[in-house]
Amino acid sequence: MRVGVERAVQGLALAGGLILLALVGMTVLSSLGALGLKGAQAGWLPQSLAIGPYKAGYEIVELALPGIIFAMIPLVQLRHAHARVELLRGRGAPTLDVVWQIVAAAMFALIAWRIGLGMAGKMRSGTETFLLALPVWWGYSACLPGAWGAAIVAAYNAVRLARA
Protein backbone atom coordinates (compact mmCIF):
# COMPACT_ATOMS: atom_id res chain seq x y z
CA MET A 1 0.00 0.00 0.00
CA ARG A 2 2.86 2.36 0.85
CA VAL A 3 4.22 2.14 -2.72
CA GLY A 4 0.82 2.99 -4.22
CA VAL A 5 0.33 5.98 -1.93
CA GLU A 6 3.91 7.13 -2.58
CA ARG A 7 3.48 6.94 -6.35
CA ALA A 8 0.13 8.73 -6.29
CA VAL A 9 1.42 11.66 -4.24
CA GLN A 10 4.63 11.83 -6.26
CA GLY A 11 2.57 11.96 -9.45
CA LEU A 12 0.44 14.76 -8.06
CA ALA A 13 3.53 16.70 -6.95
CA LEU A 14 5.17 16.13 -10.35
CA ALA A 15 2.08 17.46 -12.12
CA GLY A 16 2.16 20.53 -9.88
CA GLY A 17 5.86 21.01 -10.61
CA LEU A 18 5.33 20.77 -14.38
CA ILE A 19 2.53 23.32 -14.22
CA LEU A 20 4.79 25.57 -12.14
CA LEU A 21 7.51 25.30 -14.79
CA ALA A 22 4.98 26.21 -17.47
CA LEU A 23 3.92 29.27 -15.46
CA VAL A 24 7.55 30.30 -15.01
CA GLY A 25 8.11 29.96 -18.76
CA MET A 26 4.99 31.99 -19.51
CA THR A 27 6.07 34.71 -17.08
CA VAL A 28 9.58 34.87 -18.56
CA LEU A 29 8.22 35.12 -22.11
CA SER A 30 5.73 37.77 -21.03
CA SER A 31 8.52 39.77 -19.38
CA LEU A 32 10.69 39.48 -22.48
CA GLY A 33 7.74 40.62 -24.59
CA ALA A 34 7.25 43.65 -22.35
CA LEU A 35 10.97 44.41 -22.54
CA GLY A 36 10.85 44.14 -26.34
CA LEU A 37 7.92 46.55 -26.48
CA LYS A 38 9.60 49.11 -24.23
CA GLY A 39 12.88 48.73 -26.13
CA ALA A 40 11.14 49.27 -29.48
CA GLN A 41 9.28 52.30 -28.14
CA ALA A 42 12.57 53.75 -26.91
CA GLY A 43 14.13 53.16 -30.31
CA TRP A 44 16.92 50.81 -29.23
CA LEU A 45 15.25 47.59 -30.46
CA PRO A 46 13.62 46.82 -33.83
CA GLN A 47 9.82 47.04 -34.08
CA SER A 48 9.67 43.29 -34.81
CA LEU A 49 10.48 42.67 -31.13
CA ALA A 50 7.64 44.89 -29.91
CA ILE A 51 5.30 42.01 -29.09
CA GLY A 52 4.42 43.17 -25.56
CA PRO A 53 3.47 41.10 -22.51
CA TYR A 54 0.74 38.48 -22.39
CA LYS A 55 -2.67 39.94 -21.78
CA ALA A 56 -3.48 39.37 -18.09
CA GLY A 57 -0.95 36.60 -17.58
CA TYR A 58 -1.25 37.30 -13.87
CA GLU A 59 -4.83 35.99 -13.98
CA ILE A 60 -3.54 32.60 -15.15
CA VAL A 61 -0.89 32.62 -12.41
CA GLU A 62 -3.51 33.65 -9.85
CA LEU A 63 -5.77 30.72 -10.79
CA ALA A 64 -3.01 28.10 -11.05
CA LEU A 65 -0.72 28.84 -8.10
CA PRO A 66 -3.00 27.64 -5.27
CA GLY A 67 -3.53 24.34 -7.10
CA ILE A 68 0.23 23.94 -7.50
CA ILE A 69 0.75 24.48 -3.78
CA PHE A 70 -1.98 22.00 -2.88
CA ALA A 71 -0.48 19.46 -5.31
CA MET A 72 2.70 19.41 -3.21
CA ILE A 73 1.06 19.08 0.23
CA PRO A 74 0.25 15.33 0.11
CA LEU A 75 3.90 14.47 -0.57
CA VAL A 76 5.04 16.75 2.24
CA GLN A 77 2.46 15.14 4.53
CA LEU A 78 3.51 11.61 3.60
CA ARG A 79 7.16 12.33 4.34
CA HIS A 80 6.45 14.27 7.55
CA ALA A 81 8.33 17.21 6.03
CA HIS A 82 6.22 20.01 7.51
CA ALA A 83 7.94 22.44 9.84
CA ARG A 84 7.75 20.93 13.32
CA VAL A 85 8.15 22.08 16.86
CA GLU A 86 9.44 19.26 19.02
CA LEU A 87 7.25 19.47 22.10
CA LEU A 88 6.56 16.69 24.54
CA ARG A 89 9.10 14.33 23.00
CA GLY A 90 9.65 11.22 25.03
CA ARG A 91 7.70 8.10 25.90
CA GLY A 92 4.38 9.44 24.64
CA ALA A 93 5.76 10.77 21.36
CA PRO A 94 4.48 7.95 19.08
CA THR A 95 0.95 8.35 20.45
CA LEU A 96 1.18 12.11 20.03
CA ASP A 97 2.29 11.64 16.41
CA VAL A 98 -0.83 9.56 15.74
CA VAL A 99 -3.02 12.24 17.34
CA TRP A 100 -1.42 14.97 15.22
CA GLN A 101 -1.96 12.93 12.05
CA ILE A 102 -5.64 12.54 12.95
CA VAL A 103 -5.88 16.29 13.57
CA ALA A 104 -4.16 16.93 10.21
CA ALA A 105 -6.55 14.55 8.43
CA ALA A 106 -9.56 16.34 9.92
CA MET A 107 -8.09 19.76 9.10
CA PHE A 108 -7.34 18.87 5.47
CA ALA A 109 -10.77 17.26 5.06
CA LEU A 110 -12.39 20.44 6.39
CA ILE A 111 -10.30 22.56 4.01
CA ALA A 112 -11.16 20.32 1.05
CA TRP A 113 -14.85 20.39 1.94
CA ARG A 114 -14.83 24.21 2.14
CA ILE A 115 -12.94 24.49 -1.16
CA GLY A 116 -15.58 22.25 -2.73
CA LEU A 117 -18.37 24.45 -1.39
CA GLY A 118 -16.58 27.56 -2.64
CA MET A 119 -16.14 25.99 -6.05
CA ALA A 120 -19.83 25.09 -6.24
CA GLY A 121 -20.73 28.67 -5.37
CA LYS A 122 -18.45 30.07 -8.08
CA MET A 123 -19.88 27.60 -10.60
CA ARG A 124 -23.45 28.64 -9.76
CA SER A 125 -22.66 32.35 -9.94
CA GLY A 126 -20.63 32.04 -13.15
CA THR A 127 -17.89 34.30 -11.76
CA GLU A 128 -15.10 34.94 -14.28
CA THR A 129 -11.77 36.72 -14.22
CA PHE A 130 -11.87 40.34 -15.36
CA LEU A 131 -9.70 40.35 -18.49
CA LEU A 132 -9.54 36.79 -19.77
CA ALA A 133 -13.04 35.76 -18.63
CA LEU A 134 -11.74 32.47 -17.24
CA PRO A 135 -14.14 30.73 -14.85
CA VAL A 136 -12.91 31.33 -11.29
CA TRP A 137 -14.05 27.86 -10.21
CA TRP A 138 -11.15 26.40 -12.23
CA GLY A 139 -8.78 27.63 -9.55
CA TYR A 140 -10.85 25.98 -6.84
CA SER A 141 -11.03 22.70 -8.76
CA ALA A 142 -7.23 22.66 -9.11
CA CYS A 143 -6.94 22.68 -5.29
CA LEU A 144 -9.33 19.80 -4.57
CA PRO A 145 -7.14 16.80 -5.50
CA GLY A 146 -4.30 18.04 -3.31
CA ALA A 147 -6.54 18.96 -0.38
CA TRP A 148 -8.35 15.60 -0.38
CA GLY A 149 -5.05 13.84 -1.07
CA ALA A 150 -3.49 15.46 2.00
CA ALA A 151 -6.47 14.37 4.13
CA ILE A 152 -6.19 10.79 2.88
CA VAL A 153 -2.42 10.73 3.38
CA ALA A 154 -2.73 12.08 6.93
CA ALA A 155 -5.30 9.38 7.75
CA TYR A 156 -3.02 6.77 6.17
CA ASN A 157 -0.10 8.06 8.26
CA ALA A 158 -2.21 7.85 11.42
CA VAL A 159 -3.12 4.22 10.74
CA ARG A 160 0.46 3.33 9.80
CA LEU A 161 1.91 4.99 12.91
CA ALA A 162 -0.73 3.42 15.16
CA ARG A 163 0.20 -0.05 13.88
CA ALA A 164 3.94 0.52 14.34
What is each residue range found by the language model?
Residues 1-164:
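Alpha-helical transmembrane segments and membrane-interface helix-loop junctions
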